[in-house]
Amino acid sequence: MSTTAATTLGRELLEAARAPEFAGWLRGLRRRIHQHPELAFQEHRTSALVRAELDALGVAYVWPVAQTGVVATVVGAAGPGPVFGLRADMDALPIQEMVEWEFKSLEDGKMHACGHDVHVAMLLGAAKLLQSRRDHFNGKVKLVFQPAEEGYAGGYYVLEEGAVDDVQGIFGMHVDAGLPAGVVASRPGPFLAGSARFTATINGKGGHAAAPHHAVDPIVAVSSAVLSLQQIVARETDPLQGAVVSVTTIKGGEAFNVIPESVTLGGTLRSMTTDGMSYLMKRIREVIEGQAAVNRCTAAVDFMEDKLPPYPATVNDEEMYAHAKAVAESMLGEANVKLSPQGMGAEDFGFYAQRIPAAFFGIGVGNDGGGMAETTTKNQLHSPHFVVDEEALPVGAAFHAAVAIEYLNKNASGPSA
């Protein structure tokens, strides 16, 4: 596809998505999903909505995938070709929404505070655009509506079930309240950190607070461990390589005059590389066990890898990033495509990027000119005050579709499904 044709395609898709009827449909989808947020692996209502919309569009799908997920396929009518993937996550967060608006969450203690309602609506919009333009591309587009991104590794289980084994390239997006609507951003190579959780129990010997010499105090041991863990990042890792160790929970005794028998602590570790993740896990175990021993205690450290697979870093394939960037520039203009800094947040899109050439972009949902979604320090992901500018919905739908169509046409002579 020529540069002129690619530019024309992207702008045609964006114009179609911004048409009043289409944009209104996108807003309606997003608001329906927003009012009924569902936590990880509980996305039954959202999954049913996705399937109903796909049925209405005449798009075939497989369900269930990874418990509640849906994987749909739009088949190009221009002939055989490769398979390209687009992915959106569906789950919400255990947060009480504090935003007062007509479509506020109706589910107590649950909120789409990370924009996954936007992601689902945009991908359904892409499905509609792709289905109406099947004669414009070869091959197939797989649309992955994935459960459980928020800490429960839904993407890992989608891959384990083989739902995207035939996909040769994949693309995803995440809302970014720090960018205005109509702007996208990413970077080649490592983009988001890998992440894992840890928990540890330090066991001592309980006793009366008046006679600590008759006890073995696990609180002293856990205090030493917390302080020593900070040295891993401060003194053992390259300051130019992102790494974070955060202790976020400590639970000990209940009485003021009793030294407890044991104390538990837990937290997260993050790194931009696989080697960095392995090193942090090794040293966290050594430090906690070592500080426990120094203080006459014992420790058991658990990274919960069987229940909560660690997230790998999200690393953008250089060629796939360049492809998506070129599509965005032709559709939105170069001024609206930014180079994003690396971030220490984690995304289970990293599982896809480990196996498939992938590109992951941020899409602006902030609004600098007033309106509902003002870009402020209050409007952050995972905040009960999080809001979005719905003008981003058509942009995301068109961007998804354009990235897929242009990839398939550019690689039409490649492997066929």
From Swiss-Prot:
Pfam families, sorted: M20_dimer, Peptidase_M20
Record-listed E.C. numbers: 3.5.1.-
Gene3D superfamilies: 3.30.70.360, Zn peptidases (3.40.630.10)
Keyword Hydrolase: yes
Gene Ontology terms for molecular function: IAA-Ala conjugate hydrolase activity
Disulfide bonds: none
Coiled-coil ranges (or none): none
Enzyme kind, highest EC tier: hydrolase
Protein function: Hydrolyzes certain amino acid conjugates of the plant growth regulator indole-3-acetic acid (IAA).
Homology family: Belongs to the peptidase M20 family.
Protein name, per record: IAA-amino acid hydrolase ILR1-like 3
Organism encoding this protein: Oryza sativa subsp. japonica (Rice)
Primary gene name: ILL3
